[in-house]
Amino acid sequence: MSDYRKIMLAVDLTEESLKVAKRANQLVQAFDAELHIVHVIEPLSLAYGGDVPMDLSTVQEQIQDQAVAHLQEFSATLNVPESRQHLIFGRPESEIQRTAEEAGADVIVVGSHGRHGLALLLGSTANGVLHGARCDVLAVRVGHDDSEAE
């Protein structure tokens, strides 16, 4: 295994992100690495196909304000300074890859639900990151079927 100097933790800021963060923190400790955290907000126009007959700018601002607060709170639990917190707008797969590359990350740590069937065919954020990243990707299994007590 390579030495990881910079680790990019991609989170959706749900409770499941804590398990992913725990694994990223293990890498930080093992390699004495620098931890960055990225959260991507998908613009409502992308999420709803762009044909929304109303102005969503106020809603988008509220989502951004909440995301900023949650990211700061989440980052504080891991002692990650604001300079290594990345809140980005766009498609999660491509923005996580781009942010990791810009930060010089050696590995991206992302949660994976291990979906099957239709969800697998449609793809997932973890799958998109895995196939497009120029660095290592660690997909941490998360979900309701997890029997491991944390």
Q: Residue locations for each model-derived region?
A:
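Intrinsically disordered or low-complexity boundary/linker segments at protein termini
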Residues: 1-19, 131-150
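Structural beta-alpha unit
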Residues: 1-2, 30, 75-108, 145-150
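Small/aliphatic-rich secondary-structure junction motif
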Residues: 2-51
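General small-molecule cofactor/ligand-binding pocket signal
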Residues: 36-38, 84-88, 138
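Acidic, proline/glycine-rich short linear motifs
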Residues: 39-66, 146-150
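Short, hinge-like loop/turn segments at secondary-structure boundaries
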Residues: 52-56, 102-103, 126-127
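Glycine-rich, Arg-bearing micro-motifs that act as flexible, cationic patches
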Residues: 107-128, 146-147
